[in-house]
Amino acid sequence: MENIRSFMSFPASRKVYVEGSRPDVRVPMREIALSPTKTPQGEVENKPVRVYDTTGPYTDPDFEPNVEKGLPLLRRNWIVERGDVEETEPQSTAGRAASLPFARRPLRAKPGKVVTQMHYAKKGIITPEMEFVAIREQIDPEIVRQEVAAGRAIIPSNINHPESEPMIIGRRFHVKINANIGNSAVSSSIENEVEKLLWAVRWGADTVMDLSTGKQIHETREYIIRNSPVPIGTVPIYQALEKVGGVPEKLTWDVYRETLIEQAEQGVDYMTIHAGVRLHYIPLTVNRTTGIVSRGGSIIAQWCLAHHEENFLYTHFEEICEILKQYDVAISLGDGLRPGSIADANDEAQFAELETLGELTKIAWEHDVQVMIEGPGHIPMQKIRENVEREQELCHGAPFYTLGPLVTDIAPGYDHITSAIGAAIIGAYGTSMLCYVTPKEHLGLPNKEDVRVGVVTYKIAAHAADLAKGHPAAQQRDDALSKARFEFRWNDQFNLSLDPERAREYHDETLPAEAAKTAHFCSMCGPKFCSMNISHELQRKIKEEGMKEKANEFVRGGSSLYR
């Protein structure tokens, strides 16, 4: 792997920390330095711009990255000092057999204790995690506590992932994005997946899901979690299926239960659980154009039909909650019957499952387990709003987490664009987190460059949604970049953008000279036709004419300051 710090850093940026009510609550932000504005009267300084930062310690000059050692245990003291946890021996077979460089006994809630952020919020406690996200979001900590207590927001924070920097998912906060990584049976390695993790958080992924289905699933996930400053999500049914040789009919509750515990002990922060795919919903998909497109949903459907039994994730849901609340693993209720084509959008199967997800949400909340709801999928623009409204009604305001949605099916190779259109719209309507889509969607396993394109595309969609919702901190960066653009501060334009390297690269293709970084034009219009340069001249003339008129008024009025 190339030098981590070099590829994680951003130009003209430095890591700064905002301290909370205690010395160990230090919230990272990226501060972008700006050049001064040049005026006829001299230079006027521009204040640096602070932006939300997901890069973790990797961009801290005092931190020495080493993937074999992992990250500092940021939250360990917060977790232990509450007095609700104890160290245990690994319960899972894989956990006991693992011989990895991260030697650590897993934590679990003490008997009779609950360790979820929702539990503490309901008790009126503002945890350090809540204060941390409040500073990040520039919002009052009490609002954070209230939203988590009501189930309208979640802070994914497994007690066995103390390396993670707390973040919040909810409609009152910044729209978040998730990036999917993970190996397959035919591609990738542990090193590649860790590199994709770092690449994803470098570009702004708020959470990362490890969807590995190939070899060394346990080991790959361990390296990802130990080196991740953001919450990690999984789909446990994938690993459970691997344990039974890839044959869905051989799945059992016991195999799945052990997988839940194994992943919870490792530190997985949220798990997609397809408990809403009920036996009697499966026939509703028969006449669909694209059937069941969710991997987890299709696995469960195959099991249900083979045994002609109800989904064991549905029948054992109370037990799932009992397990996960011991580690503060949030549940992401999977949309196993989501539409996989525009033709199937908003159909009976999709909304039948959504109603069940609402029932399961209430059960999870009774256990103080944090919940978010997964959503589609492939939805034409005119049907997007209904999805948000139904989810809010049926699922009692729980955060909505959607894959896109793609608004058309005709653009393989460009589905990061077809889905970002839908993502921006659904985010503006109130979706809390957007799962990215890369250009490789429907075509193959994404590589490092695909991850970059997918994350940046979805940061655009999420930010556009924040602007539409009127988030108080959203427009600061836009205004700073617009000002830099009008003043021809090219380097500041690049540095304020979501992808500075790409912006600089495109500019320098035609105007590579350093002198071009102060030119009052680009290659699009040239020096004679630049509208902003012409606007500068217009403003200058108007101001001059205005000053002349004021001077004439002064003379006509007797040249006296006092009348």
UniProtKB/Swiss-Prot annotation:
Example of a GO MF term: carbon-carbon lyase activity
Single GO biological process annotation from the record: thiamine biosynthetic process
GO CC, any one term: cytosol
Annotated binding of [4Fe-4S] cluster, by residue: 522, 525, 530
Disulfide linkage: none
Positions with a binding annotation for substrate: 180, 209, 238, 274, 294-296, 335-338, 374, 401
Biological or metabolic pathway of the protein: Cofactor biosynthesis; thiamine diphosphate biosynthesis
Catalysed reaction equations from the record: 5-amino-1-(5-phospho-beta-D-ribosyl)imidazole + S-adenosyl-L-methionine = 4-amino-2-methyl-5-(phosphooxymethyl)pyrimidine + CO + 5'-deoxyadenosine + formate + L-methionine + 3 H(+)
Superkingdom of this protein's organism: Bacteria
Protein name according to UniProt: Phosphomethylpyrimidine synthase
Species of the source: Geobacillus thermodenitrificans (strain NG80-2)
Upper classification of the organism: Bacteria, Bacillati, Bacillota, Bacilli, Bacillales
